[in-house]
Regions:
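Alpha-helical "hinge/linker" immediately C-terminal to small N-terminal DNA-binding modules
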Residues: 2-30
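Amphipathic alpha-helical segments that line or abut small-molecule/effector binding pockets
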Residues: 15, 25, 43, 47-59, ...
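Immediate post-signal peptide segment of exported/extracytoplasmic ligand-binding proteins
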Residues: 30-37, 124-126
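Central regulatory/effector-binding core of bacterial HTH transcription factors
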Residues: 34-92
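Short, well-ordered beta-strand segments
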Residues: 38-40, 83, 107, 131, ...
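C-terminal regulatory
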Residues: 77, 89-173, 178, 182-203, ...
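A late-sequence structural motif
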Residues: 197-235
Length: 235
C-alpha cells in the first residue's frame, strides 16, 4: 500500500511538472497579444454555460484569451490554469469558490406535458421513464422532497452530461430534471416545459477551483467575470 501511495504522489508531481512546462510562459502574452488562462471543464459545462459567455468573459475589448481544456478529472492547477468542477467543494489543497446555486425541476416535451395534464401529482411522473444526468442522485433528492421513494425502472435512462439529458427529454424519451439556471437556456431552446412546480435545491454546485496562494491578475479578472455572469444567470 505504501508503494501505491508513493506512486500516486510521484504521478501528481509529474502531472504538475508537465502543467508548469506547458504553461512555462504562464499567463504571458502570446502571438495574439492577450493574457491566456486555461480552464479545465467538463464538456456539458463548456457547451451549456461557458462557451455562450466566452466573449463577455474575455472582455470588451478583449484583454484575456480563454483556452478550454475538456477533462473529467481534476487537472493540475498552475499560475495559468484554473478548473470549474461540480461537487460540494472543500477539496483538499485547492481553493474552491461556488459559482451559482441550482434548483432541480422536472421538465419534459410537450406531448408528455399534455398527457400529464395541468396539475399532475408528483407520483404521476413515475409513469414515465426518468432521465438521469450522470447519476440518480438528483431524482432521488427531488422525489424524497415529495415524500416519495425512487425505485429504478428498466425504462429509466442515464446520460453522461446535462445537455444530453435535456436533448433526450426533448425527443420524448422521458422526464428530466432541469438544473436551473445552469441548463435554462438549453431547455428553452429545446421547447421543454415544466411538468411539476416543485423546485428542490441541488446539493452539488459548480465551483471555480484554483491552487492556493497568490493569483495572477488575469486569473483574478476572469474569476470576477465568471462570478458576474453567474449572478446575471440567476437574476
Amino acid at each position: 500500500m505504501r508503494a501505491t501511495l508513493d506512486g500516486e504522489r510521484f504521478a501528481a508531481r509529474i502531472e504538475l511538472a508537465m502543467a508548469m512546462l506547458h504553461d512555462s510562459r504562464g499567463t504571458g502574452r502570446s502571438d495574439h497579444g492577450l493574457d491566456t488562462v486555461r480552464v479545465g471543464v467538463v464538456q456539458s459545462f463548456a457547451r451549456l454555460w461557458l462557451t455562450p459567455r466566452l466573449a463577455a468573459l474575455e472582455g470588451t475589448p478583449p484583454d484575456l484569451r480563454i483556452e478550454m481544456e475538456i477533462d473529467n478529472a481534476h487537472m493540475a492547477l498552475s499560475d495559468a490554469r484554473i478548473a470549474i468542477r461540480l461537487g460540494r467543494g472543500g477539496w483538499p489543497n485547492v481553493v474552491s469558490e461556488p459559482l451559482f446555486d441550482e434548483g432541480l425541476q422536472p421538465f419534459a416535451c410537450q406531448k408528455i406535458a399534455v398527457e400529464l395534464g395541468p396539475d399532475p401529482a408528483a407520483r404521476d411522473l413515475l409513469r414515465y421513464p426518468l432521465i438521469h444526468d450522470a447519476s440518480e442522485a438528483g431524482w432521488r433528492r427531488w422525489l424524497t422532497a415529495q415524500d416519495l421513494v425512487y425505485h429504478p425502472k428498466g425504462s429509466d435512462r442515464t446520460f453522461g452530461g446535462h445537455d444530453l439529458a435535456l436533448i433526450a427529454a426533448a425527443s420524448g424519451m422521458g422526464i428530466a430534471l432541469a438544473r436551473k439556471p445552469y441548463g435554462s437556456e438549453q431547455h428553452e431552446r429545446l421547447g421543454l416545459v415544466s411538468v411539476h412546480p416543485a423546485v428542490v435545491d441541488n446539493v452539488e454546485r459548480f465551483h471555480i477551483v484554483t491552487r492556493s496562494g497568490a493569483r495572477h491578475g488575469a486569473i483574478e479578472r476572469l474569476i470576477q467575470r465568471l462570478q458576474s455572469q453567474a449572478r446575471q444567470s440567476q437574476a
